Amino acid sequence: MATINQLVRKPRVKKVVKSNVPALEACPQKRGVCTRVYTTTPKKPNSALRKVCRIRLTNGFEVTSYIGGEGHNLQEHSVVLIRGGRVKDLPGVRYHTVRGALDCAGVKDRKQGRSKYGVKRPKA
């Protein structure tokens, strides 16, 4: 335990917390324009073609964002909303596109977990 005199001479140093999603700049979501839509492969031991897109955000950042769900309608110049959240098996992908917002359509024929994929409640 430090004495008061020691604390007067050299105060305690606050820990600096580094953000996992710096491009969002403390906002919940950000809007951007797709510059490239492509597929990439995950790291070992997984195998797939993951759908991702490169996005130029309104604040000037250029980030890679994952497109969740089965099928999508994104292409170059599509305006999308991104949120934080990394994809563990894709290095460098730290953002998710928000389905059902702006130009990104919701997932077709989705029945469960609809809110995460921008799907309205089906008619009974």
Swiss-Prot record:
Q: What is the effect of changing L81V?
A: In streptomycin resistant stra1
Its domain of life reads Bacteria
Q: Which InterPro entries match?
A: NA-bd_OB-fold, Ribosomal_uS12, Ribosomal_uS12_bac
- Entry keyword set: Antibiotic resistance, Methylation, Ribonucleoprotein, Ribosomal protein, RNA-binding, rRNA-binding, tRNA-binding
Instruction: Output the Gene Ontology cellular-component terms.
Output: ribosome; small ribosomal subunit
Q: Which Pfam families is this protein grouped with? A: Ribosom_S12_S23
Q: Which residues carry this modification: 3-methylthioaspartic acid?
A: D89
Gene Ontology molecular function terms on file: rRNA binding; structural constituent of ribosome; tRNA binding
Instruction: Report if keyword Zinc is assigned.
Output: no
Could you describe the subunit structure of this protein? Part of the 30S ribosomal subunit. Contacts proteins S8 and S17. May interact with IF1 in the 30S initiation complex.
Q: Which NCBIfam families match?
A: rpsL_bact (TIGR00981)
What function is annotated for this protein? With S4 and S5 plays an important role in translational accuracy. Interacts with and stabilizes bases of the 16S rRNA that are involved in tRNA selection in the A site and with the mRNA backbone. Located at the interface of the 30S and 50S subunits, it traverses the body of the 30S subunit contacting proteins on the other side and probably holding the rRNA structure together. The combined cluster of proteins S8, S12 and S17 appears to hold together the shoulder and platform of the 30S subunit.
Name the family: Belongs to the universal ribosomal protein uS12 family.
Protein name, entry field: Small ribosomal subunit protein uS12
Q: What is the lineage of its organism?
A: Bacteria, Pseudomonadati, Pseudomonadota, Gammaproteobacteria, Pasteurellales
Q: Which gene encodes it?
A: rpsL
